[in-house]
Amino acid sequence: MSLAQDIAILKRIPMLSDFQDDQLRLLAFSAESMDYSRGQRLFDQGDRADGGLVITDGTVSLQTKGADGFEEIEQVGQGTLLGETALLTENKRPCRAEAIDAVRIIRIRRALFKRMIQEYPELAQRMLDQRVSRFRYTVSALKPVGEKMAELEQLNAERRVKDDERQS
C-alpha cells in the first residue's frame, strides 16, 4: 500500500481527523507497517499496550475471555484504530485480536504520537475537545439507565418493606 493510501485511511479515523495532510504524512512515514497471516494474533487480552494499531487491510476478530474460553465480540476492518487510549496513556489490551484473513496494520507507538502532539500542540487541544464531547454524549446516553436503576432500587426497597411487614 502506498503512503498516500495510508494517509487516506488515517484521515478517516475520528481521533486523527483534525490532522493536516503533512502531519498525517509524518505520522504514516514514522509509524511501523506490519503484516499478519490468517489466524495470527495481533495481541492478547491483558498485554501491555504501547500504542495504537490502524487496520489498513483485512479483517480482525476481537475476542474476550469468558467462562468457556475466548468469545468473539466484534469483527473490524480497514480504517479501525485499535488502542486509541493507548496512544495517550499506558494500559492493557482489553481483548484479544486475531487476523481472520491477511491483515496489514500501521503501528503507531505512544512515544511517536506524543512527539506529534508536542510538535503540534493545537492537535492536543482538538483531541481534548473531541474526548470531552464524547464523554458528554456518553453521560447523557447513560442518564436514562441511571434513572431506570433508581426506579428499580425504589421498587426493590418497597418490596422489602412489604416482605418485612408480612413476616411481622
Residues covered by each model-derived region:
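Short hydrophobic/aromatic patches on the structural cores and recognition surfaces of FHA
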Residues: 20, 39, 58-60, 79, ...
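Cyclic-nucleotide recognition modules
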Residues: 74-129
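A residue-level structural signature of the nucleotidyltransferase/glycosyltransferase Rossmann-like core
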Residues: 8, 52, 73-74, 105
